[in-house]
Swiss-Prot record:
Major localisation: nucleus
Annotated family: Belongs to the NSA1 family.
Basic and acidic residues composition bias: residue spans: 84-107
Species in which this protein is naturally found: Lodderomyces elongisporus (strain ATCC 11503 / CBS 2605 / JCM 1781 / NBRC 1676 / NRRL YB-4239) (Yeast)
Region (Disordered): 83-114, 414-447
Subunit note: Component of the pre-66S ribosomal particle.
Protein name (Swiss-Prot/TrEMBL): Ribosome biogenesis protein NSA1
GO biological process: ribosomal large subunit biogenesis; rRNA processing
Chain's gene name: NSA1
Keyword RNA-binding: no
SUPFAM superfamilies documented for this protein: WD40 repeat-like
Annotated keywords: Nucleus, Ribosome biogenesis, rRNA processing
Length: 447
């Protein structure tokens, strides 16, 4: 397996290569094949750390950093010569050695070259740095989403302030375009529709769910060869309405943390979404059934940090919170009386809750900030500095790797175990034997 994670402490990233069964907390268990620092930039540190990291169509890795920086890296790996003593031995110790690298940065738009001081010990960086876009935001304005628009060959970067920038990565000389979301002043969640890239949903602290069309669906990347700015005028398609007052007749506060679009069994022109909140709720919206959520489930007493679908049918979700919860819930199977509380004025209060299908347990001791579901596996990482990989369905732990750094984002690059050299040699020999046999048969047929 290969997983790329961010390094909050250093502002860089780490590439981890390991097999199923790896566990750095046990000396006699399988250890990682590789843990290597990468994506170092000049003056990289905690204040310029990577918040979001995405795989852009197996062409680039794109990272949104604090301070308004969007960094572009080549997806292809360079062969990197490691000093033997710097390769992690994986003995389960928490003294994670910081590795050094020497990197020559080249900006393709200006052809300027800059030597970066040596901060670790490689001949070159694992992923070549290609370009850096600067977005005009304040240092305190945190990026809350990085989404790709394949049809436009672009990405969208959303910030807490409500600013959303469109960046065309097909031309590194492109000037990022600011998109003005009507009436939006604070964001904590931003999502693009997987099948309608011109449609987005957003929300945040006291910003209830809204759906907007950013541009006409007929627009594609050719627009950037023209006067394109007039083509991007966001308009609101849907505004959600808050749930009814609580049992004390008090207004329920709004604080959306994640948004997902449903794509299965949704009528054209209508939208169905699920959101999580800072107050531990899951809410499902269906625009054909009005502005209020059609379902409102309390699932946690602490803020929900991440939310992803757990299967292709979109009937399960995997979520994490600020404590140590990493769990899978069913959206089809509902426990009607799972949530019970008592109020002096209203008596017993009973609410339905999605069925807890199970927790992912592996000794997690802190908030999980990053997760990805990919090809039947799910990876988690966060404040306790461990990367954990599980089978989504069985929830069996497949690998546990100590990284030595806090993680905000991760990408599963490869879910398969790398074959060892002996296995690779055996396969090469078998292929050569097969080729030789077929070659001899061809010669006999010709005779």
């Amino acid at each position: 397996m290969k997983v790329l994670t961010t390094c909050d402490d250093t502002g860089a990233a780490k590439l981890c290569s390991f097999k199923r069964g790896t566990d750095t907390s046990k000396k006699d268990a399988t250890q990682p094949d590789l843990i290597e620092n990468c994506m170092n930039l000049p003056k990289s540190n905690y204040k310029t750390r990577i918040i979001h990291l995405i795989n852009y169509n197996y062409q680039y890795f794109i990272a949104s950093r604090l301070g308004g920086t969007l960094s572009i890296y080549d997806y292809e790996e360079n062969d990197v010569a490691m000093k033997p003593q710097e390769k992690q031995e994986g003995n389960g110790s928490k003294s994670d050695k910081e590795q050094k690298s020497s990197l020559k940065v080249e900006s393709e738009s200006t052809n300027s070259k800059e030597n970066i001081e040596e901060v670790a010990g490689y001949v070159e960086e694992r992923f070549k740095f290609l370009h850096e876009f600067k977005l005009p935001v304040s240092m305190n304005d945190r990026p809350i989403a990085l989404q790709k628009c394949e049809k436009l060959d672009s990405v969208l970067v959303a910030y807490e302030s409500g600013k959303v920038y469109l960046v065309y990565v097909g031309d590194f000389s492109f000037e990022p375009l600011l998109l003005h979301l009507p009436g939006c002043t604070h964001l904590n969640a931003f999502a693009i529709h997987p099948e309608q890239e011109n449609v987005v949903a957003f929300g945040g602290k006291e910003t209830d769910l809204q759906i907007a069309e950013l541009y006409n669906s007929s627009v594609n990347s050719k627009i950037f060869k023209k006067d394109y700015k007039s083509a991007f005028v966001p308009k609101i398609l849907f505004k959600a309405k808050n749930v009814s007052n609580d049992h004390l007749n008090l207004r329920v506060p709004i604080w959306i943390t994640n948004i997902l679009f449903f794509t299965n069994n949704v009528t054209n022109g209508q939208y169905k979404l699920i959101t999580s909140t800072r107050y531990g709720q899951l809410r499902i919206y269906d625009t054909k059934h009005g502005r209020k959520p059609v379902k409102d489930y309390p699932v946690s007493t602490t803020p929900i940090l991440t939310l992803l679908f757990g299967n292709d049918k979109e009937t399960e979700v995997v979520l994490t919170d600020t404590q140590n919860l990493m769990a899978k819930y069913s959206l089809d199977i509902i426990d009607d009386k799972a949530f019970k509380t008592n109020s002096a004025s209203a008596g017993d209060i009973i609410k339905p809750v999605p069925k807890l299908l199970g927790k992912y347990t592996g000794g997690n001791t802190g908030a999980t900030l990053a997760q990805q579901v990919y090809e039947g596996i799910v990876a988690f990482a966060g404040l306790d500095r461990y990367l954990r990989v599980f089978d989504v369905e069985s929830r069996q732990i497949l690998a546990k790797v100590y990284l030595g750094v806090e993680v905000s984002s991760l990408i599963i690059i490869d879910d398969e175990d790398e074959e060892n050299e002996e296995e690779q040699k055996r396969k090469r020999d078998e292929e050569e034997e097969d080729n030789e046999m077929w070659s001899q048969l061809d010669k006999k047929q010709k005779v």
